[in-house]
Amino acid sequence: MNKPVEPNSFRTGPDEQGMFGIFGGRFVAETLMPLILELEEHWNAAKNDPAFKAELQQLGAHYTGRPSPLYFAERLTEHLGGAKVYFKREELNHTGSHKVNNCLGQILLAKRMGKTRIIAETGAGQHGVASATVAARFGLPCVVYMGATDVERQAPNVFRMRLLGAEVKPVTSGHGTLKDAMNEALRDWVTNVEDTYYLIGTAAGPHPYPELVRDFQSVIGQETKEQILAAEGRLPDMLVAAVGGGSNAIGLFHPFLDDKGVAMVGVEAGGKGLEGDEHCASLTAGSPGVLHGNRTYLLQDSDGQIKEGHSISAGLDYPGIGPEHSWLKEAGRVEYVPIMDHEALEAFQLLTRLEGIIPALEPSHALAEVIKRAPKMGKDQIIVMNLSGRGDKDIFAVAKHLKMDV
Amino acid sequence: MTTTRIDRLFTKLKAENRPALVTYFMGGDPDYETSLSIMKALPVAGSDIIELGMPFSDPMADGPAIQAAGLRALKGGQTLDKTLRMAKSFRQDNDHTPIVMMGYYNPIYIYGVDRFLTEARASGIDGLIIVDLPPEMDEELCVPALRAGINFIRLATPTTDDKRLPKVLENTSGFVYYVSMTGITGSALPDTSKVAGAVARIKGHTKLPVCVGFGVKTASQARAIGAAADGVVVGTAIVNAVANVLGPDGKTTADPAEAVATLVRGLADGVREARITAAAE
């Protein structure tokens, strides 16, 4: 594949067809096409509407608790002996992760479109919980599709969703994980086209989802920019974030894409290693293909059949990635690297002991990369990492891996 | 474009004043050889057009029956290459029944569009139905397929309103596949009078034949739909006929080709009576 010519700006995508270079697009069944066009129309109106922005900002401030702090991790920095490490504390948001930023934006959009029923897919349950939360807040019924395997391994989040009034539908088709949940959500949407809004949890899917989810998450990077300028008087040298579908990473990265001095690293789930099939590193070990409405890097076999991924973190357990990340990889603007399960587990424990913060397993992957890089950087350099979620949901999984009883 | 087997078939059926019976089956379900025997049995039992399903790991527009059939085929080692080979093998003794390959884009994209079209043409493929390629993505496969002389058959759905229909029909050829409801394959058939209205609406925009599918399972439904449509598509019922003769271990308990043929003979009688019944009423 030819490398695209470096654009003047990395922040202008997607184009009118929803493409980021060759990635993105609208690969959906005809039944859904009119719905996606309708969504695009409403999104284009909403993003330029000051009242929409104001309502979202108001909810962000008083419901989510924005801005989230930018925290200087003093003890970790000292321990690593290199670059100063800052955390963007998205784990302090209501519902415990960055997911709520997107859910609030999209439910306002759903309301604007007159939709009366919300559907969502979830892997670890973080997006499911955030969707159920905003659906409760706005009084809309919510159905969450979740792979049967995930329902079993994420019992506390399933209960949370049910408490919030959502109906959790276990998906047994395929292999019962996130990609099957997404297939099932699409099947629901294609059936209930009149009243239903599909609240996608990451910056992927058919256009305009990758764009609108990114824009709702970009509040992370915008705040970071102001906060780091206030704290340090300059921009950071490096941004680090975990990528599953890639919404927390694109949210942090996007406002900085044209700041040439800021390096960016997206951290994928290397699982048990890239040699076999037990990983979710679609950008490092996959190839471009078409799934779930967009062209992007996927884990697939030589016949174009999609593989199941593996990660210790259910939130990274998806064989694809948002299309903008695929484009940023090929453009060379962002570097993507894998982190293994065991490295993430070690990072999880280190942060817990050093800073008194229990991170989710997803940002623990980003942290493991920070642990590798910070010592090699100068003490005058700055890394900002997106601490995208808290680890309460993961204590059972971690206990199992550490062979401890809860 | 020169006339294709599909065009010739509809001209012939128009003269006979009857709708086409379009039968879908999953290539490679439960294995290559059995599946090829099913394919060969279809026209003998009265099928006019064969839709050859290409299995995909993530069939987002299909119901449980076709999902399961696809997984069985993949487990049995089916690949796009083998599906093309199956068509080629079928063509050795049948040169008139149109074959339309139906499935999702990714396996074709990975195979390579140009290579696929060359092979498809050499294998006697007449048309393509690719569920996840709406007109907005025509440059991907539709335009190259038309250039290669292969029909690109588009799905029109209840959500395709009059404003959008011209766009959907623009590069469509062969026939238009009207999906009788919003939903996945194999759901319940809607009110047949609604279907007739929808067919009339589409015919107001195109001279192409309109075939109706999604939800047709029995001969009487085929007869009712066939009164208004130029063709009746049956898929899930055929896939189920295969599943019904598979034991829990995946071994066949009866001949799947014969099970499918029995069903198709009934459906063929249904479509042949469609216009006669309609005229008598």
UniProtKB/Swiss-Prot annotation, chain A:
Keyword flag Lyase: yes
Signal sequence annotation: none
GO molecular function, one term: tryptophan synthase activity
Residue positions where N6-(pyridoxal phosphate)lysine is found in the record: 99
Enzyme Commission code: 4.2.1.20
GO CC aspect terms: cytoplasm
Name by which UniProt lists this protein: Tryptophan synthase beta chain
Native species: Chelativorans sp. (strain BNC1)
